[in-house]
Amino acid sequence: MSGLRPALSTFLFLLLITGGVYPLLTTALGQWWYPWQANGSLIREGDTVRGSALIGQNFTGNGYFHGRPSATAEMPYNPQASGGSNLAVSNPELDKQIAARVAALRAANPDASTNVPVELVTASASGLDNNITPQAAAWQIPRIAKARNLSVEQLTQLIAKYSQQPLVKYIGQPVVNIVELNLALDKLDE
């Protein structure tokens, strides 16, 4: 019985620290230092939430830039089912999926002159990626220009405006957020 009291008091102390103090402290610091990120990096138009800057959306129309394929099968870009496809590079099923995606992209983008960018046919590790390279966005310009009756120049400028450079110049590559880019594309029509 004498060993029960120190064990119980240690348990209660650690429960208070790890279950109360630490979560409250990290939440408060997150809200203070990074309020936008701590609240989900939500993209708002007025009072309406249009998406998150961290999670891709399933844009499928010809008038939109398409992002990386989602690995969340039943409902694309479902954050509750996040995860990669887990198919190895040597798996024939992955080859079939990529071939089908290439064929679909070629059919939807007949005016594209170069090879299909790799990130448009391969899912990210999370299956929710919202970024593609500016080159992958530019590859889609002819389709979008035709669907929205916009000039190639307008779309090129839009991609340049929404492209983000890596934090460190030689580590990483420039990316463009598909959700933000497509929302800006919708504003061009207004």
Curated annotation (Swiss-Prot):
It comes from Shigella flexneri serotype 5b (strain 8401). It is found in: Cell inner membrane. This is Potassium-transporting ATPase KdpC subunit. Its main location: membrane. Keywords: ATP-binding, Cell inner membrane, Cell membrane, Ion transport, Membrane, Nucleotide-binding, Potassium, Potassium transport, Transmembrane, Transmembrane helix, Transport. One of its GO terms (molecular function) is P-type potassium transmembrane transporter activity. InterPro entries: KdpC. It comes from the Bacteria. Pfam families: KdpC (PF02669). The system is composed of three essential subunits: KdpA, KdpB and KdpC. Belongs to the KdpC family. The chain crosses the membrane at residues 10-30. It is a single-pass membrane protein. Part of the high-affinity ATP-driven potassium transport (or Kdp) system, which catalyzes the hydrolysis of ATP coupled with the electrogenic transport of potassium into the cytoplasm. This subunit acts as a catalytic chaperone that increases the ATP-binding affinity of the ATP-hydrolyzing subunit KdpB by the formation of a transient KdpB/KdpC/ATP ternary complex. NCBIfam families: kdpC (TIGR00681), PRK00315.1 (NF001454).
